[in-house]
Every structure is written in C-alpha cells, then in structure tokens.
Amino acid sequence: MEVILLERVAKLGQMGELVRVKDGFARNFLLPRGKALRATAANRDKYEHMKADLEARNIEAKAEAAKVAEKIDGKNVIVIRQASETGQLFGSVSVRDIVTSFEADGVKITRSQILLDAPIKTIGRHTIEVAVHPEVEVGVSVTVARSVEEAERINRGEDISSRREDQDAAAEAIAAAGEFFDPDAQQDEEPEQQ
C-alpha cells in the first residue's frame, strides 16, 4: 500500500514522502496513529492543503522536544538491582525501569521514546538514546548497581571488580599472617561438665 507520511517515521521517510509499506503496517500502525494517509488522489490534494499547518505543528513539537532534550541531555539515572559477584544481574533492566527512574527525577518520558536494543543485564554505566521527537535524539546514561554507594563509585570511574580483588588480597594477607581461627588451639577455660 502506498501512503503519504504526515510526520517523520524512523527507517521509513520524512514528512510528505510517498512510500510503499506493507498493508498491515499501514492499517495497524501508520493510519490509526495519524502518521500517514492513503495515497489516493483526493488525499494528495488534502495533504497539499494541510502541508503548511502540519509543518507549523511539527516545528512547535520540535521546539518543545528540544527543551526536554536540553533538560535530559547527558543526564545520569541510577537503577538499583540485585546482582552476582561477577556483575551479572538477577534479571535485567528494561525500558520500563528506565522510565520509572526518569519519573522519579521529575522527567516525563514514554517507553516508546527510549531506544534500547536489548535489556541491560550487567552492572555498570550504560549509554542509551532517547528520541524525544522523531528528529531529536539525546544520549543519557544509566548506572546499574547493587547500592547507591556502588553507583556513586561507578560514576566516579572506579572499577568495582578491582575493588573486590583488593579486598580478597587483604583477606589473604591476614590469613598469611596467622590471624585466623585455628580449630586445634587450646581454649583458656573448659566448659563445666554435668
């Protein structure tokens, strides 16, 4: 089916372009959401009359999106999750979790605006894209950690795994010095027998 795009659609085209799409995509997504019109002669004339109004609305929406983009550009949100010692999460961080973190910071973003290829499954700092408008995308970082303190260390650039190795080395040094429990050692007092 041929349609006329009423706004920019990712991986499809710009506003006003005549594109050929599968019938189901047009009927179930583009037409009901007002993103396109069927490419009939009457609709082509209708689009030409609406073109100036659509462009004005697009400019207004883009300006509002630019304000939101300025507010969140480079922003860092923290998501706390349980994880193993190796940094693998017990579960994952999805788009819904990221939206919830933004809402906690007072920023209104929808799930469809976050461009995340696959759920996040490891501890660390991850960069994702947020499309606040079809023509405006910004990068934000998501810090996934087991605690707020660990998130702060990750944001400072500390390597969490090397810190664990340092703790293990300190424990081995204490053990080598002989400051550990000896099960064969004599006790000072013997318990009373009954």
Curated annotation (Swiss-Prot):
Record Pfam families: Ribosomal_L9_C, Ribosomal_L9_N
PROSITE patterns found in the cross-reference section: RIBOSOMAL_L9
GO CC annotations, alphabetized: ribonucleoprotein complex; ribosome
UniProt keyword terms in alphabetical order: Ribonucleoprotein, Ribosomal protein, RNA-binding, rRNA-binding
InterPro entries in alphabetical order: Ribosomal_bL9, Ribosomal_bL9/RNase_H1_N, Ribosomal_bL9_bac/chp, Ribosomal_bL9_C, Ribosomal_bL9_C_sf, Ribosomal_bL9_N, Ribosomal_bL9_N_sf
Source domain of life: Bacteria
Keyword Ribonucleoprotein: yes
A GO BP annotation: translation
Biased segments, Acidic residues type: 181-194
A GO MF term: rRNA binding
Annotated S-S bridges: none
Stretches the record annotates as Disordered: 156-194
Comp. bias intervals (Basic and acidic residues): 156-167
Role of this protein: Binds to the 23S rRNA.
Entry's family note: Belongs to the bacterial ribosomal protein bL9 family.
Name used for this protein in its record: Large ribosomal subunit protein bL9
Organism: Rhodopseudomonas palustris (strain BisB5)
Gene symbol of the encoding locus: rplI
